Amino acid sequence: VVDAIRASKGSTLFVCSLADMQGETWGLTAREHVEALMDHGTRGLLDYVLVHTPVSLRPDSPATGVFTAVTGADSEHASTADLDDLVLSGRIRPVRVCYQDVQAIQAQGPVVIARNLVDPIHPTWHDPAALRDAFAGVLKLCRSRRR
């Protein structure tokens, strides 16, 4: 895959997960996701990184709070109706991002685009309309960089 990306003339976009479940990416921040990709051969190949944040990122405020109900922090009151077969036992965590992470990612080359991407009905899924709008913005950026 990395060789195909390297051979391509197209721009690349990494869409960071909203939440992760137990496994290889358990507990990773958005920055750590990007660094893992770079460590596996994509260094210098990522043009854009799309991350979810429910609030504007500022130097002193990490984005938190949207996933309280699905992280197990409030599992007594959380609804499982929109989580399909997932069990609320702390096995789902948000992929966190903060201002410093965005700065660190951009220092390595990619442009970071931070948007509220969560599906209001399925809080661990990306909202298709929000993704569409973000992708349209990336396409505009790609065209403007070519000029």
Stretches found by the model and what they are:
Residues V15-S17, H52:
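Generic beta-sheet signal
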